[in-house]
């Protein structure tokens, strides 16, 4: 696929709006540079426009629609790192960040099974929102792992988009109506019957490696495993 985006360069943009999504996740809407284009599932490198932080770049996935008049990111804070996400969460509307060229991440290849852990849901948000807008979300299934219900990013919207095909599993705080435990071989064997469909996997490096290897061992075609690279 040929991807078209803006000229490769740094773009200084202002924060337009902030929304608290969970206790440690914020949604950022920022100015969209003229001619800036991305495909849902793609990402860019972001830094804060301050002298000591300009070169501290971190990758974040776009979570809005490509035709939106703004860029949107959904960013989890990691306070123990005392780094970029901490600083980003301290910013206010009017503050500036730097976005760079778009790079390919997760590409939608048709109806399948989305498997996410924590902040790994972010590339899927853009894809699922795109499908929902086009009335093409049917046929997709989501398995989303988090520690507690309070950690689930955009819980209600995912239910709206996917209905009963949105499945949530909790690893630390069992609750009625939710699966309990990690997404491991036993879980996948119990929940899945079609291993020929596309699988979209995003989460920690360890989770992606383990889930991808497990799916391949259960019969999934390696070419049908879509992971962030």
Segments from the language model and where they lie:
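Ferredoxin-reductase
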Residues: 2-93, 146-148, 171
């Amino acid at each position: 696929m040929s991807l078209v985006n803006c000229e490769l360069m740094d773009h200084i943009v202002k924060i337009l709006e902030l929304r608290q999504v969970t206790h440690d996740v914020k949604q950022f809407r920022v100015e969209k540079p003229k001619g800036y284009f991305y495909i849902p599932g793609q990402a860019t490198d972001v830094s804060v426009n301050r002298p000591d932080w300009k070169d501290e770049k971190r990758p974040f996935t776009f979570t809005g629609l490509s035709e939106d008049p703004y860029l949107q990111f959904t960013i989890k804070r990691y306070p123990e790192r005392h780094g970029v996400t901490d600083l980003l969460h301290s910013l206010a509307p009017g503050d500036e960040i730097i976005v760079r060229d778009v790079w390919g991440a997760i590409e939608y290849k048709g109806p399948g099974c989305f498997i996410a852990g924590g902040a790994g849901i972010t590339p899927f948000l853009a894809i699922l929102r795109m499908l929902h807008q086009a009335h093409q979300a049917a046929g997709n299934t989501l398995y989303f792992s988090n520690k507690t219900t309070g950690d689930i990013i955009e819980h209600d919207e995912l239910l709206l988009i996917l209905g009963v095909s949105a499945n949530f599993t909790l690893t630390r705080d069992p609750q009625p109506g939710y699966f309990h435990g990690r997404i491991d071989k036993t879980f996948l064997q119990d929940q899945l019957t079609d291993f020929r469909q596309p699988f979209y996997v995003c989460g920690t490096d360890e989770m992606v490696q383990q889930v991808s290897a497990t799916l391949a061992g259960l019969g999934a075609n390696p070419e049908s495993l879509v992971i962030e690279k």
